[in-house]
Amino acid sequence: MESKMSEKKKFGFVVLHYCTLDMTKKCIAAIQEKMAQADYEIVVVDNASGNGTGKDLAECYKDTEHVSVLLSKENLGFAKGNNLGYVYAREDLHCDFICVMNNDVILLQDNFAQLVEAAYEAHQFAVMGPHIE
C-alpha cells in the first residue's frame, strides 16, 4: 500500500509583518531559497503597519509567485494576525502544512520539507514546534 506522504504536500508559511520591511524581506528570501524545490506558499500578514511598509510589500511582491500579502485594516495583534494568515493558507491556498512564524525568523534548514514530511509520517502530529537554541 502506498503511503499518503508519497503525494507532494504543499507548505504554507504565515509571516506576521509590522513595520520592519527589511526583516520581512530577508525572511521571505530565506523561505524562497530553502523551499525552491518544494510546493510552497508564503502569506505575509501586514498588521496595519503605520509606516506604509505593508503597502510597500504588497507592491514589491505583487507579481511574485508563491507570495501573497494580506493588508489588515487594523492591528489584530499577534494571535488574530496569524489566524488571518493561517485561514487564508488553509482555505484559499489549500496548504497541507502551515508554519506560523515571525518576520525575524530565517529558515536555515535545507531539507525542511523532507524533515516535516518524515516527522508527520512517523507521528501524525497536529502541531509541531521547532528546536530553539
Range-by-range predicted roles:
Residues 106-133:
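Conserved donor NDP-sugar-binding/catalytic core segment of glycosyltransferases
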Residues 46-55, 74:
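A conserved acidic beta->alpha catalytic loop
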Residues 94-106:
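Short beta-strand-to-loop acidic/aromatic patch adjacent to the donor-nucleotide binding site
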Residues 53, 81-82, 109-114:
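Acidic donor-diphosphate engagement hotspot in glycosyltransferases and nucleotidyltransferases
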Residues 30-39:
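Short, acidic, metal-binding catalytic loop of nucleotide-sugar glycosyltransferases
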